A protein has these predicted regions:
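Cytosolic, long alpha-helical scaffolding segments
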Residues: 1-167
Length: 167
């Protein structure tokens, strides 16, 4: 859950990169997320090697449950990395106000998608997760349209690629 909180803050900070110079904060949060990811990996590895201990301490029933935690941690860590990169490219790019507003709108859609996906994970709502996976394609198409309209802008390819990877 700490990684989730960090990822949400990073997405929000990346979204406001045009208005605020917060790239250093994003960079620091990414290091925190990386540290927590490796800690989670070590804990999961311990749990797989010592299932009885983990079962007693954390009420975890199976190795499958541990692997689900690993998948969630990997997903969140990827989101953190791509949010950091997207913020870097937004910082480097020179967009007009219309482009900035459109990009912030896309970022808001991605942020909503991430929050809803994590909610589906926490509540174990598979149906919601599957619907969100289907709606992901729509956001990717919005990213592609944004790229096509602005393909002559510096860093746009890298930025759009990171936005699409964030989902």
């Amino acid at each position: 859950k700490k990684m989730d909180v960090i990822a949400r803050a990073m997405i929000n900070d990346a979204k406001t990169t045009f208005d605020e110079d917060n790239y250093e904060n994003i960079e620091q949060r990414d290091r925190d997320a990386n540290r927590l990811f490796f800690l989670a990996c070590r804990a999961i590895k311990f749990g797989l090697r010592n299932p009885l201990t983990v079962s007693q301490l954390f009420n975890i029933e199976s190795g499958e449950e541990l692997l689900n935690y690993r998948l969630a941690a990997t997903y969140i860590e990827k989101v953190c990395d791509t949010a950091k990169r997207a913020a870097r490219y937004m910082h480097l790019a020179k967009f007009n106000e219309k482009q900035k507003k459109e990009l912030i709108k896309i970022f808001t859609q991605i942020e909503y998608q991430f929050i809803e996906m994590m909610d589906a994970y926490y509540t174990n709502n598979r149906e919601k997760a599957l619907k969100l996976c289907d709606s992901k394609e729509e956001i990717i198409q919005v990213c592609d349209k944004f790229y096509l309209k602005n393909r002559n802008s510096d860093w746009i390819g890298f930025l759009v690629n990171n936005l699409k990877t964030m989902m």
